[in-house]
């Protein structure tokens, strides 16, 4: 019997959200980080994110909702953009991303944002 090592893939969660105001936020599903790299990757590949309709994100620890990344404002599409964690993260803890329409958005148009985050 032959045994081959399996590649370790980091957890990736998709999102497809609509925000009608700057009130409230939405979470992705939780996932484990499968490597020791202290970065996460964000793709925003559809929606109407812009300089007037700003999408805000932050990574949180699922067990206590503690922030493990800085809040980041996004004004355009991104492809596997790399962001560092603000706290040390590990492979035995569940994490999720919380998103919202940023308070500094100047349009009342609903914000639509879709993509994926890799922990």
What are these model-predicted stretches?
Residues 29-30, 78-88:
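Exposed aromatic-hydrophobic patches
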Residues 45-49:
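Short solvent-exposed strand-capping/beta-turn motif centered on an Asx-Ser/Thr pair
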Residues 39-42, 87-103:
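Noncatalytic modules at the cell exterior or secretory-pathway interfaces
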Residues 1-33:
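N-terminal prepro-regions of secreted/extracellular proteins
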Residues 33-37, 52, 90:
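Short, surface-exposed loop/turn motifs at beta-strand boundaries within globular domains
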């Amino acid at each position: 019997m032959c045994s081959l090592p399996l590649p370790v893939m980091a957890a990736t969660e998709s999102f497809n959200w609509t925000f009608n105001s700057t009130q409230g936020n939405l979470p992705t599903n939780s996932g484990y980080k499968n490597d020791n790299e202290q970065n996460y990757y964000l793709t925003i590949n559809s929606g109407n994110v812009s300089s007037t309709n700003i999408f805000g994100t932050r990574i949180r620890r699922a067990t206590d909702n503690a922030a493990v990344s800085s809040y980041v404002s996004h004004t355009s599409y991104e492809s596997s953009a790399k962001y560092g964690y603000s706290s040390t993260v590990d492979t035995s803890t569940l994490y999720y991303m919380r998103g919202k329409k940023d308070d500094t958005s100047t349009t009342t148009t609903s914000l639509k944002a879709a993509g994926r985050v890799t922990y």
